[in-house]
């Protein structure tokens, strides 16, 4: 039995999702009395220049680099073999060896497809349990390695795909994707309407525009939606200050029709009162939407995991997928007017959601390593007041 295990969580800053999952798992371990938890951006620390370049290319995949990313994602999936695995395993390997020697973790968790640890296990024979937490509603072969002890996945569909690839079913646990605990709290919606100055007698359309300009023509969209009766548009610009300032002029003209925010710390509050949301199909965003049963309109998914996520939610009846700018207004307005379909989409979201995924994952890991959790109760936070 390990009394005070040290946990190493490896992640990467490609989008916010992988890091957010790592932080959620870290917080969950700490809540259960496991204090020695380290979160490391292995690629960023090992190869900062290469990481900056690849992060730039990743962001460009939203605009000019879609075909390049399609080729990378699906091309690597088709030709992935031992040579590619060996080449990829060298990324971060030197830093990893130093990290393992210095920290001597008892448990390693990947929230990004980093195969350096299982590859090191294979080559050196070190005995350390390795867990992969998949952060999308699909699986790429790059996540899979014989030396990974267990995989935590979003859905039974992902599990079936992995079994077909050759992963033993007993190594895969369907838990859902870890999300922030705030999305699983109960909050009085009246408080939210008052806090954000929203109209209870209007439907609310939430547009999550993001900080990297991944949602096109936001201003024009807002102008169109502002003409729809009994609709209030809420735009979250993230850290895109230029977009926020551009939209504030529209808000001043008709504050009852449009509300503009920058970065919203407790965005779950807006999820709770929206009728539907326009967003990109990231795995964490979709998991959060499923937790609060928010129908989603998925805007122009990038080829790769975004497209796979979007197709899964579309098949389940939980999402409308937009692949052309000209479709956004008409399809969104039609959905907002169709209460029956909105209800069906909410039910579909409910069927996808898996409650308390972070707890499920952490409890499983601790049980497998014979650790007795010492749960530290945490009071439910008061409704956050900070948003910009």
From Swiss-Prot:
<dbReference type="Pfam" id="PF06925">
    <property type="entry name" value="MGDG_synth"/>
</dbReference>
<dbReference type="GO" id="GO:0047228">
    <property type="term" value="F:1,2-diacylglycerol 3-glucosyltransferase activity"/>
</dbReference>
<dbReference type="Pfam" id="PF04101">
    <property type="entry name" value="Glyco_tran_28_C"/>
</dbReference>
<dbReference type="InterPro" id="IPR009695">
    <property type="entry name" value="Diacylglyc_glucosyltr_N"/>
</dbReference>
<comment type="pathway">
    <text>Glycolipid metabolism; diglucosyl-diacylglycerol biosynthesis.</text>
</comment>
<keyword id="KW-0444">Lipid biosynthesis</keyword>
<dbReference type="InterPro" id="IPR007235">
    <property type="entry name" value="Glyco_trans_28_C"/>
</dbReference>
<dbReference type="GO" id="GO:0009246">
    <property type="term" value="P:enterobacterial common antigen biosynthetic process"/>
</dbReference>
<dbReference type="InterPro" id="IPR050519">
    <property type="entry name" value="Glycosyltransf_28_UgtP"/>
</dbReference>
<comment type="function">
    <text>Processive glucosyltransferase involved in the biosynthesis of both the bilayer- and non-bilayer-forming membrane glucolipids. Is able to successively transfer up to three glucosyl residues to diacylglycerol (DAG), thereby catalyzing the formation of beta-monoglucosyl-DAG (3-O-(beta-D-glucopyranosyl)-1,2-diacyl-sn-glycerol), beta-diglucosyl-DAG (3-O-(beta-D-glucopyranosyl-beta-(1-&gt;6)-D-glucopyranosyl)-1,2-diacyl-sn-glycerol) and beta-triglucosyl-DAG (3-O-(beta-D-glucopyranosyl-beta-(1-&gt;6)-D-glucopyranosyl-beta-(1-&gt;6)-D-glucopyranosyl)-1,2-diacyl-sn-glycerol).</text>
</comment>
<dbReference type="GO" id="GO:0009247">
    <property type="term" value="P:glycolipid biosynthetic process"/>
</dbReference>
<keyword id="KW-0808">Transferase</keyword>
<comment type="similarity">
    <text>Belongs to the glycosyltransferase 28 family. UgtP subfamily.</text>
</comment>
<dbReference type="GO" id="GO:0070395">
    <property type="term" value="P:lipoteichoic acid biosynthetic process"/>
</dbReference>
<protein>
    <recommendedName>
        <fullName>Processive diacylglycerol beta-glucosyltransferase</fullName>
        <ecNumber>2.4.1.315</ecNumber>
    </recommendedName>
</protein>
<dbReference type="InterPro" id="IPR023589">
    <property type="entry name" value="Pro_diacylglycrl_glcsylTrfase"/>
</dbReference>
<dbReference type="GO" id="GO:0005886">
    <property type="term" value="C:plasma membrane"/>
</dbReference>
<keyword id="KW-0472">Membrane</keyword>
<keyword id="KW-1003">Cell membrane</keyword>
<keyword id="KW-0119">Carbohydrate metabolism</keyword>
<keyword id="KW-0328">Glycosyltransferase</keyword>
<keyword id="KW-0443">Lipid metabolism</keyword>
């Amino acid at each position: 039995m390990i009394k005070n295990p040290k946990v190493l969580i490896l992640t990467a800053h490609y989008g916010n999702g992988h890091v957010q999952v790592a932080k959620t798992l870290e917080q969950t371990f700490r809540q259960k009395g496991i204090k020695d938890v380290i979160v490391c951006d292995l690629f960023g620390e090992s190869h900062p220049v290469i990481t900056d370049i690849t992060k730039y290319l990743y962001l460009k995949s939203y605009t000019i680099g879609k075909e390049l990313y399609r080729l990378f994602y699906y091309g690597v999936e088709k030709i992935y073999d031992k040579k590619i695995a060996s080449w990829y395993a060298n990324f971060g390997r030197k830093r990893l060896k130093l990290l393992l020697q210095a920290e001597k973790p008892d448990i390693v968790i990947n929230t990004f497809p980093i195969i350096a640890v299982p590859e090191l296990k294979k080559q050196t024979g070190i005995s350390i349990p390795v867990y992969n937490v998949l952060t999308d509603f699909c699986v790429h072969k790059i996540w899979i390695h014989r030396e990974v002890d267990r995989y935590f996945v979003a859905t039974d569909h992902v599990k079936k795909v992995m079994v077909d690839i050759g992963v033993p079913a007993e190594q895969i646990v369907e838990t859902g994707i870890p999300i922030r605990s705030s999305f699983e709290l109960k909050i009085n919606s009246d408080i939210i309407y008052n806090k954000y100055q929203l109209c209870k007698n209007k439907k609310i359309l939430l547009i999550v525009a993001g900080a990297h300009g991944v949602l096109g023509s936001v201003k024009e969209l807002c102008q169109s939606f502002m003409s729809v009766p009994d609709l209030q548009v809420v735009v979250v610009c993230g850290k895109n200050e230029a977009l926020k300032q551009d939209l504030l002029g529209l808000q001043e003209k008709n504050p009852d029709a449009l509300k503009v925010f920058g970065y919203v710390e407790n965005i779950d509050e807006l999820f709770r009162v929206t009728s539907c949301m326009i967003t990109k199909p990231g795995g964490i965003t979709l998991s959060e939407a499923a937790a609060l049963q928010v129908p989603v309109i998925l805007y122009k998914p990038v080829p790769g995991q975004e497209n796979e996520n979007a197709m899964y939610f579309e098949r389940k009846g939980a999402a409308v997928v937009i692949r052309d700018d000209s479709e956004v207004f008409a399809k969104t307005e039609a959905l907002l007017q169709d209460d029956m379909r909105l209800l069906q989409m909410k039910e579909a979201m409910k069927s996808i959601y898996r409650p308390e995924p972070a707890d499920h994952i952490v409890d499983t890991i601790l049980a497998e390593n014979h650790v007795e959790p010492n749960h530290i109760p945490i009071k439910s936070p008061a409704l956050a007041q900070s948003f910009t």
